[in-house]
């Protein structure tokens, strides 16, 4: 594989790690209501586990409330059960037509737990970025031995890989700092 291809592949892997982290962080509750909080919830619909977003509309009338309106009233109990069984820790209020989720304010202890969780997610993303860098550098070194790539070209490629790595690590740190600030803001 050519050196440019190796760098492009490693960069793509690093980008995927950052995108995945961004997606993970968007599901972390930070004190205000967001329809994304319910993205991972699956509802039993005609015997199949179906994403909640495909069987109901989800709105946020204010910063502390999420309203789930099922497209079929018969699903309201199943949706309520799915929300109760989820790790969100929110008790749904069912009025027969829609479900209201009142988000209680986060306690200091819960905020710290969420920060710890997001820090772990950020660290996992950093590990993925480092692994992509290591794999690329190993492949570059291998190409010097087997393909006859010149040493100076390999050194330049390794330096380029390090720059790309540093850029993605910085992005991860920025995403984490932003989410930490959002979580800790009362």
UniProtKB/Swiss-Prot annotation:
Gene Ontology biological process terms, A to Z: translational termination
Gene3D superfamilies, alphabetized: 3.30.1360.40, Ribosome-recycling factor
InterPro entries, per database record: Ribosome_recyc_fac (IPR002661), Ribosome_recyc_fac_dom (IPR023584), RRF_sf (IPR036191)
Positions of disulphide bridges: none
GO molecular function: ribosomal large subunit binding
Entry keyword Transmembrane: no
Gene Ontology, cellular component aspect: cytoplasm
UniProt keyword list: Cytoplasm, Protein biosynthesis
UniProt cross-references to Pfam families, sorted A to Z: RRF
Protease among keywords: no
UniProt subcellular location: Cytoplasm
Role summary: Responsible for the release of ribosomes from messenger RNA at the termination of protein biosynthesis. May increase the efficiency of translation by recycling ribosomes from one round of translation to another.
NCBIfam families, alphabetized: frr (TIGR00496)
PANTHER family: MITOCHONDRIAL RIBOSOME RECYCLING FACTOR PSEUDO 1, RIBOSOME RECYCLING FACTOR
Family under the similarity heading: Belongs to the RRF family.
Protein name: Ribosome-recycling factor
Upper taxonomic lineage: Bacteria, Pseudomonadati, Bacteroidota, Bacteroidia, Bacteroidales
Gene name for this UniProt entry: frr
């Amino acid at each position: 594989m050519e050196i440019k291809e190796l760098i492009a592949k490693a960069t793509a892997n690093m980008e995927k790690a950052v995108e995945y982290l961004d997606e993970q962080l968007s599901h972390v509750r930070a004190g205000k209501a967001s329809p994304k909080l319910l993205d991972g919830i699956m509802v039993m619909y005609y015997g199949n586990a179906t994403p909640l977003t495909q069987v109901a509309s989800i709105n946020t009338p204010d910063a502390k409330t999420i309203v789930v309106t099922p497209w079929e009233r018969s699903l309201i109990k199943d949706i309520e059960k799915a929300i109760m069984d989820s790790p969100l820790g929110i008790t749904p209020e069912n009025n027969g037509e829609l479900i209201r989720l009142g988000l209680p304010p986060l306690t200091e202890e819960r905020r710290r737990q969420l920060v710890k969780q997001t820090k772990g997610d950020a660290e996992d993303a950093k590990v993925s970025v480092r692994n992509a860098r290591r794999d690329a550098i190993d492949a570059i070194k291998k190409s010097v031995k087997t393909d006859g790539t010149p040493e100076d070209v390999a050194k330049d490629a390794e330096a380029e890989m390090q720059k790309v790595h540093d850029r993605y690590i910085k992005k991860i740190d920025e995403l984490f700092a932003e989410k930490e600030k959002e979580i800790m803001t009362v």
